[in-house]
Regions:
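C-terminal catalytic/motor cores of large multi-domain enzyme assemblies
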Residues: 1-234
Length: 234
């Protein structure tokens, strides 16, 4: 994505859109919260061609096989790269164009109910493809599964959790005020999953159907994607 010189009103993670039509200018003014005006879409996809593609790719990839999840992440990156309006977000009642395409998801350190979780983020490039995204996912997932490591977002949350409750609430309130004006630290934007283009939840990995998930008032996430279980269909 082409980098533009930062101007007054821009954020660390996005460029203020100054040429909106009247409808898009007024929308964030009459819906004060990010979750007040959402759209939900559910799609059923024939995986025949994807399964054949995965079989071919995995003939030479045995250490970290390609999966449906990897292909869907790559498809989301490609779609949003080609349709940059999907990568807009609202903050402080203004529309912004995000500076990059990024994806976030939760990784279980072990496949067990009581196992710890880690938060992973990948930052895509204009030239990203299935192979490069697969490599990014390999790095993130293997790193997150290391039981001796704690990801940045979890580490930050633990930091607040160990404080006296009143102090933690006060500091989070300060962060929300900073975010309204685009002053939140860049370190949070780079690692917090709710500051990415899309949060992905692979419920199919635990045999659940696809559900719906709202956006959050915290952060700037533009899309929330749920992946359901694969099933045979006539």
């Amino acid at each position: 994505m082409e980098k533009k010189k930062r101007r007054w009103g821009d954020r660390k993670d996005g460029v203020l859109l100054r040429d909106l039509d009247g409808m898009h200018f007024i929308t964030p003014l009459i819906y004060p919260n990010r979750c007040d005006n959402e759209a939900y879409i559910r799609e059923t996809i024939d995986l025949t061609n994807m399964n054949a593609y995965l079989k071919k790719k995995n003939e030479s990839e045995t250490e970290f096989p390609y999966t449906m999840f990897h292909i869907i992440v790559a498809g989301l990156v490609k779609t949003i790269t080609l349709r940059p309006k999907m990568n807009r977000f609202i903050a402080n009642k203004n529309f912004y164009q995000r500076n990059e395409v990024s994806m976030s998801f939760v990784v279980k350190k072990q496949f067990a109910d009581e196992a710890a979780e880690a938060l992973a983020v990948i930052h895509a490039k204009d030239e990203s493809n299935v192979e490069s995204i697969h490599e990014d996912l390999r790095h993130q997932i293997l790193d997150c599964k290391d039981v001796h490591k704690v990801d940045s977002s979890t580490d930050n949350m633990d930091f607040f959790n160990h404080m006296p409750r009143f102090l933690g609430k006060f500091l989070v309130w300060i962060l929300t005020r900073l975010d309204i004006h685009g002053w939140i630290p860049a370190s949070i934007i780079e690692t917090d999953p709710y500051y990415t283009t899309c949060v992905i939840s692979n419920l199919g990995s635990i045999k659940l159907n696809c559900g719906y998930h709202h956006l959050t008032n915290w952060g700037t996430c533009s899309v929330f994607c749920i992946i359901g279980e694969k099933k045979m269909s006539p």
